[in-house]
Amino acid sequence: MSSEVDSNSHHAAVVIDNGSGVCKAGFSPEDTPRAVFPSIVGRPRHLNVLLDSVIGDSVIGEAAARKRGILTLKYPIEHGMVKNWDEMEMVWQHTYELLRADPMDLPALLTEAPLNPKKNREKMTEIMFEHFQVPAFYVAVQAVLSLYATGRTVGIVVDSGDGVTHTVPIYEGFALPHACVRVDLAGRDLTDYLCKLLLERGVTMGTSAEREIVREIKEKLCYVSMNYAKEMDLHGKVETYELPDGQKIVLGCERFRCPEALFQPSLLGQEVMGIHEATHHSITNCDMDLRKDMYANIVLSGGTTMFRNIEHRFLQDLTEMAPPSIRIKVNASPDRRFSVWTGGSVLASLTSFQNMWIDSLEYEEVGSAIVHRKCF
């Protein structure tokens, strides 16, 4: 694929999906993101004049992941919300460098979590216009974009990434905020839980670098059980994972015990709803006339919904809670890890969307509060 994009091409734009764990970026109207990298900023663990001159003050993304042994890794986004704007700015700068794009050349569409605080949206708008000097800007709700990626405008999105899980009912392209449920349990919590389960086996994975290895183990070997109690009795099939230093870790029931927390958060000591319960709660909070459509259009989205068997277990557990006559359909696209980005690319390329952009003139006239008027 060419590394260039024609800025004069029809409705070209930069699309950036800011995930808590992974940043996905590329150009509209392309189908897949060109840059996918960890949303991490690494800083040297120990002050070392020689080392500092070699790797600089901070390292972003893949480079930070590669040098994790000598770095302390930080995530600028926690539970879907930006917590450190200076580091977030570094991640965006790195994004444009990877895309080999000048921010001043193309409009930028960024994503946000549902129920994102107003001040966060304003800060994002301010940075994009003031620091990056983009010609036009828009911020869209992640779950809505996931729904667009499936060609729907009505349905409920169960979006679980690294930092947060949301169940978001959407009607005619608009999220219904009163029925959204946010659960602060997602991929990062499952990684921590797997660290704890490995500790029970006598394997200590405590540093931020070792946690990244555990995340890789989780993504490669874990799966969702259809019958947790029964499989616990059978202890699960054993798999071996080889660490970079050659040491081998044996995993048995940990492989399904880890993602089980999505359905039974009490395993983590959390008093929150499982993903099937949160979905049921969201649908129940919708208008009676919408519920049938919601049950028939459930869309799984985000990296933490990529576990094998998750859609079958989800359907099984939700069916037990739903009215007996209701038809439930769960959409689990193989590309759902990138569905937010894909939906953003689709939206930014629509002719009908072009008058939705906030342009620099509007920003100069109104300021960052313009984002509430044009992005909802």
Curated annotation (Swiss-Prot):
Job of this protein: Required for optimal embryo development, particularly under heat stress conditions. Also appears to have a role in negatively regulating spermatocyte cyst development. Under heat stress conditions, required for the correct organization and migration of nuclei during early embryogenesis, and therefore possibly functions by regulating embryonic actin networks during the heat stress response.
Localisation: Cytoplasm, Cytoskeleton
Entry GO terms, CC: actin cytoskeleton; fusome
Domain of life: Eukaryota
Consequence of gene loss (knockout): Increases male fertility but overall population fitness is decreased. Males develop significantly more spermatocyte cysts with actin cones per testis, suggesting that sperm production is accelerated. No effect on female fertility at 25 degrees Celsius. However at 29 degrees Celsius (heat stress conditions), embryos lacking either maternal and/or zygotic Arp53D activity display gross nuclear abnormalities and nuclei appear disorganized and uncompacted. As a result females produce fewer progeny that reach the adult stage. No effect on number of eggs laid or the percent of fertilized eggs.
Pfam family, any one: Actin
InterPro entries in the record: Actin (IPR004000), Actin/actin-like_CS (IPR020902), ATPase_NBD (IPR043129)
Region: Necessary and sufficient for recruitment to the fusome and actin cones of spermatocyte cysts, residue numbers: 1-40
Gene: Arp53D
Record's protein name: Actin-like protein 53D
SMART domains membership: ACTIN (SM00268)
One GO term (biological process): positive regulation of embryonic development
Species this chain originates from: Drosophila melanogaster (Fruit fly)
